[in-house]
Design a protein with these regions (language model features):
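Acidic, polar-rich low-complexity tracts and alpha-helical solenoid repeat scaffolds
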Residues: 1-171
Length: 171
């Protein structure tokens, strides 16, 4: 599939889609560095239409994921932050960037630095829940928020957060 997508038959109109599909195939094959390079190259192309614009947003999400898997958390966060508030992927980005902040928190040496990253993670989840409370990922985001409050030793807030999840799913 990767060879076919890179072939000369791919016209300019489909170039961004082909590069994106190639990067996804590379990532699925475990070739994360190649995928990152393909995604980075994709951002050098001009956006010609609405489809290219959506591919661009998907590219930012994919870059965030690939760089996260490569352990380059700063690059992951930078990629996620390219997604705008009006994007239909905004809630997904906030959920994923939260995990990047958690990962960065776990890499910190001091408790103060860990807490600073956890606060960023909490803020991202809170923005997600306020901006789109009906998002399909809102229940998972609430559970994540509860866990973040546990890590910050905000036990009462964590309990209330978990209770709100239970109440939402009670028959």
């Amino acid at each position: 599939a990767i060879k076919r997508l890179a072939g000369p038959a791919i016209g300019k109109a489909y170039r961004s889609r082909a590069i994106y599909a190639t990067a996804v195939a590379q990532a699925a094959a475990g070739r994360l560095k190649e995928a990152a390079e393909s995604l980075d190259n994709l951002l050098k192309l001009d956006v010609a239409d609405d489809i290219d614009s959506e591919v661009r947003e998907l590219t930012h999400l994919a870059r965030g994921r690939v760089y996260y898997e490569l352990g380059n958390i700063d690059a992951s966060i930078d990629a996620y932050q390219e997604i705008g508030v009006r994007s239909k992927y905004f809630d997904q980005m906030l959920f994923e960037i939260t995990w990047a902040y958690v990962k960065r928190a776990e890499e910190q040496e001091t408790q103060a630095d860990r807490e600073a990253e956890y606060r960023k993670a909490i803020r991202a989840v809170e923005i997600l829940l306020v901006s789109d409370p009906r998002s399909p990922i809102a229940p998972d985001a609430k559970v994540l928020l509860g866990n973040l409050h546990l890590r910050m030793k905000n036990y009462q807030i964590a309990v209330k957060t978990f209770e709100s999840v239970v109440e939402a799913f009670e028959p």
